[in-house]
Structures are given as C-alpha cells and as structure tokens.
C-alpha cells in the first residue's frame, strides 16, 4: 500500500497551490504515494486559472478523511469553510487562519496515524506566531533539528529563527552537543549512513583566530566536539564558514552543523535553490520546500516547483530509510566490521547457514 502524504497548502495568497499542483502532475509522484492536500477547494480552483492551459482541466477528489484518498488522484480536504477571499501577494487575516487550520488538521491526522508523513507549503509566520519547525516540536515527540538537504549536502542549525542579538546566549556546549547527537542519529536512521562525518562551523571570523576574535570556539565549540567524539560521533572542526564552503571542503562530509540560520542557509541556497527543509529529531516525518510564500510572484505562473517536488520525494525516502533502520535495529544480526576503500567502517553481517566456524576443540 502506498503511503498517504499530507500536503498543507500554506498561505492562500502565495505560491503554495501553484508549486503543489505543478509537482503533483509529475507522473512519478503518484507511483510512490497517495497525496492528500489540506486546503480549500475553491481557492485551489482560483489558483489553477493562473497556470498554463495544461492545468485547467484538473479535477479534484474532494474527501473528508485521508482514508478516502484514491490512488492517482488529486485528493483534497477542505479545512477552512469560511468565506476565503484570495488576495494574491498579500498577507491577510483570512490567509493566516486558513493556513493554520490546514496545518492543525494535517497534524491531527498525522498524530492519529491516518497519514504517514507531512509536507508543508510555505506560510507567513504571522499565521502561527512562529515557524513550522517550532510549531511541530510542541505537538510531537522529540527535539527538533532544522536540516536543509540537497543531494549529499546537508546543513543543520544550532539556532533557528532567532535574532542575531540572541545567538550568543544560545551557543552553549550543551546545545551544540545535543544538536550533534540529533544530527548523527538522523543521518543514520533517516539517511542510512553507517558512520556519518559531521563538520562543525565556527561562530567567529577565522574560527576565532585562537581567541583574538572571540573565545566561543575554544571555550564552547571545541569542548562540545570533543565530547561528541567521546560518544562515538565523528565530528570535526570548528571550520571558518567562508573558507569551508569557498574551497569545497564541505564535499568531504555527510553533513554540516552551522551555528545560526544565515550562516548555514546563505551558502546552502547559493549552491542550490531547489533544496528541502527537513525537520529531524521528531517521531514524525516532515519536509517542506526551501523557499517562502513568494508574494512577489504569486499568481504569475513563475514559481519553480522543483523544491516542493524534492520535498515530496525526500519524505518518501526518509519513510523508507526509517523503516529499514528500525527493522534492522529491532532484530540485530551479528556482524563484523571491516574498512571500506576510503577507510570507513562497514558492517558485514554473518550468515550462519553458509559460514563455518572452528572452535579451539576442533583443532589438532
């Protein structure tokens, strides 16, 4: 049975419906999931009329519950029934209420096990008073870790949506170690990496230059890295962000832990504007496109749907990887560890049916 994926429509006056519709008309999407859009049917129809002719004949399967979702159809649950005027490019009270109603309903269905993963289209933070990541952490089990993903490039954050003035107080040894632990666990369970290599970025220019430009590296970040190593986490650094990304050094790691939002997102988006925001650390799977509401291009048929499509596929990939990991760790097989060609440890499981062992008693 294909997993049911909840897709919240986001801000009704932004590009959410546009990127969702364009993404779902990629035929392969329906081969791996049953999508259910949480939004408003009337609003969806208005957005369709702003798109190319090929989208005009779309029909919706209007349902009341995810269990009614049909394979190969655009399933939609109407979550906000009040009069909902569409004012493209504007943040309004109606659009905020509609966005929150869709997210609340989708989260309720996710918690009830009616859907298997959540993909969220962009919202204006006024709708929630906070970001998606912080909202979800309060409603599901676990500690959140914001991670941006694009192929083998993964950038996680110590600090999410906080002002620059608040960052120094949040850069603590305990917090960095917690984020490193969450990141390491996610790379193993969600991405199938046996022994991930994690690069940790410095806070200050030139990694503090031995304390001349700040002491956070010596007093906080390096001790956190050392403690992570003691726990078996392959953490390295701290690295000055400019040289680390400018030299391409990031390609030698499975993930990067940045100290704050712009330190991580500026190089990430410079390298790829079609990445995905993944909320790691929680007991649910949630992804989203790595862009905002797009008020400036809403209704102009200019939105690039690739980030949304990548978010849909990443949700499926993580679901599969988690299932494989949980099955493997629930019934662990005996194994030996050998190094691969790059010197990384690799598990080789023992098959007792084909492998013969001689104990000391069998020897002459």
Regions found by a protein language model. Name each.
Residues 132-163, 286:
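Flexible loop/hinge segments that line or gate small-molecule binding clefts
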Residues 1-135, 174, 178-259, 263-277, ...:
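Contiguous, glycine/small-aliphatic-enriched amphipathic segments in soluble metabolic enzymes
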């Amino acid at each position: 049975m294909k997993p049911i994926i909840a897709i919240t429509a986001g801000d009704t006056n932004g590009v959410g419906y546009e990127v969702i519709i364009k993404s779902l008309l990629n035929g392969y999407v329906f081969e791996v999931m049953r999508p259910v859009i949480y939004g408003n049917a009337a609003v969806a129809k208005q957005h369709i009329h702003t798109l190319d002719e090929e989208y005009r004949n779309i029909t919706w399967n209007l349902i009341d519950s995810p269990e009614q979702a049909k394979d190969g159809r655009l399933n939609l649950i109407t979550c906000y029934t009040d009069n909902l005027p569409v004012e493209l490019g504007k943040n309004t009270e109606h659009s905020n209420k509609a966005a929150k109603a869709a997210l609340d309903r989708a989260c309720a269905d996710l918690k009830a096990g009616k859907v298997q993963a959540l993909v969220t289209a962009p919202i204006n933070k006024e709708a929630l008073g906070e970001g998606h990541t912080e909202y979800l952490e309060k409603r599901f089990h676990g500690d959140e870790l914001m991670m941006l993903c694009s192929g083998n490039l993964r950038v996680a954050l110590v600090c999410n949506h906080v002002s620059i003035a608040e960052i120094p107080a949040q850069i603590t040894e305990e917090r960095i170690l917690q984020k490193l632990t969450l990141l390491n666990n996610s790379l193993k369970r969600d991405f199938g990496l046996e022994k991930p290599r994690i690069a940790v970025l410095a806070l200050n220019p030139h990694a503090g230059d031995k304390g001349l430009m700040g002491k956070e590296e010596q007093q906080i970040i390096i001790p956190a890295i050392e403690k992570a190593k003691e726990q078996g986490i392959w953490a390295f650094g701290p690295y000055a962000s400019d040289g680390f990304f400018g030299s391409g050094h990031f390609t030698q790691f499975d993930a990067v832990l940045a100290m704050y939002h712009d330190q991580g997102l500026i190089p990430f988006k410079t390298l790829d504007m079609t990445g995905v925001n993944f909320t790691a650390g929680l007991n649910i799977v949630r992804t989203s496109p790595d862009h905002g509401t797009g008020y400036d291009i809403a209704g102009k048929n200019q939105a690039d749907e690739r980030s949304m499509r990548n978010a849909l596929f990443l949700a499926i990939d993580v679901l599969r990887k988690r299932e494989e990991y949980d099955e493997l760790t629930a019934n662990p097989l005996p194994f030996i560890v050998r190094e691969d060609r790059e010197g990384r440890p690799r598990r080789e499981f023992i098959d007792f049916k084909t492998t013969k062992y001689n104990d000391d008693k069998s020897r002459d």
